[in-house]
């Protein structure tokens, strides 16, 4: 909501009164800046650079734009990852067969981060923290094996829920007129429904909120499309929601199972006033037009050096 919490300090480059020149730092990037400031204040020199590998991991995993400071952080952080002496990160790279391979932002986003995140989605997030902080090689290796297994379980659970959700949507013609897809299933895994909501949003190019029902309570995770502020939509429907939080493109909420039909109706009435048919058509975003002769190894290397 557009209110700052009552706290001693709220450090966020997105604050309306912030003069910081770059507003798209990930949370881990903001913490990195705080550590940097503390190192200056306490005369600790460049000790803050010891955390660059972690900051790079978190920045890519948080899917913030890799531009400006984020690009610099990730570029230098990747160099630190490749030469890391950290037991946990080294074992993770070994297990993923990246001990002697170049590492890129793709490697972090699609190889390392899913395994680290699997701990919080499927099991206990503290396991991932332990991996990143342990000095014991055997413990690190055991944790990496566990995270691999949990990531495989996450993948299979995701496929199963996605299949069920798509079947519900495609077998019910009433979803054709809905601009916001509200889909609920019995005891769907809370740690995975956000990922599945993203998949459904991509498939149908419609905002989607996926709910897991249990004991007459529905816990949901939603994803949206450009032009539809999901948080504002939930504010509009707040009378039917027990609690919620989020931002323009993603949100989490809890609703009574009895209120789900009314919630679906209300949020779609709101969407009808915001979205038109053109908004529901996927748009191809073109970053730049280039000539064939510009597609050279030299130019690729030059771009990588930026």
Please provide the spans of the model-predicted regions:
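Short gly/pro/ser/thr-enriched loop/turn and capping motifs at secondary-structure boundaries
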Residues: 1-4, 17-19, 215-218, 228
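Conserved strand-to-helix beginnings and helix N-cap segments that scaffold or border functional pockets
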Residues: 4, 125, 193-195, 264, ...
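Short alpha-helices
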Residues: 4-44, 48-60
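Cysteine-nucleophile active-site neighborhood
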Residues: 35-37, 259-262, 267
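Hydrophobic helix-and-loop "lid/oligomerization" segment in the mid-to-C-terminal part
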Residues: 39-260
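A contiguous loop/helix-start segment that scaffolds small-molecule binding in enzyme catalytic cores
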Residues: 63, 86, 269-306
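Short amphipathic alpha-helices in soluble, non-transmembrane regions
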Residues: 234-238, 264-271
